[in-house]
Amino acid sequence: MAEVPGAQRPVLAGGPEPRDPLDCWACAVLVTAQNLLVAVFNLLLLALVLGTILLPAVIMLGFGFLCHSQFLRSQAPLCTSHLRDPGFTALLVTGFLLLVPLLVLALATYRRLCLRLRLADCLVPYSRALYRRRRIPQPKQIPVSPGSRSVPTPGKVWV
């Protein structure tokens, strides 16, 4: 039998309540958009951290490859006035040696930023798009009068 767009689906006892098809589609689009925004922000943050921390090694490797006679043979005044081939070889070696420790430092910094910003908590599971959240009824709180003493809970000791 065909489903009517406004009709409610039957609810299983104790389970989550399914959404209407149109509501489910709209929520799925919104969940996808939010997850894509979080992913883009993660990539931008990763690019910023990697670009900042790896910049010294990238500059050394760039000048080493740009100015060494075995690679590009550039005759730019910046290359010929300061160093010769042994100096550019030293730049290449130092750049490659610095690359791995700086990469580890950059990834540790990115992880710490992700944990501090709680970016993993911003990702929404798709089950939220398919099912409505049920409200769990809260137990009623009995107001305590100012003159009465509160009874300590078992297992906790106040010193």
UniProtKB/Swiss-Prot annotation:
| InterPro entries on file | TMEM88
This protein's membrane topology, according to the annotation, is: Multi-pass membrane protein
- Keywords, ordered alphabetically: Cell membrane, Developmental protein, Membrane, Transmembrane, Transmembrane helix, Wnt signaling pathway
Q: Which GO terms describe its molecular function?
A: PDZ domain binding
Subcellular location field? Cell membrane
Q: Enumerate the transmembrane spans.
A: 43-63, 88-108
Role: Inhibits the Wnt/beta-catenin signaling pathway. Crucial for heart development and acts downstream of GATA factors in the pre-cardiac mesoderm to specify lineage commitment of cardiomyocyte development.
**Protein family per UniProt:** Belongs to the TMEM88 family.
Subunit architecture:
Interacts (via C-terminus) with DVL1.
**What is the name listed in the Swiss-Prot or TrEMBL entry for this protein?**
Transmembrane protein 88
Organism equals Mus musculus
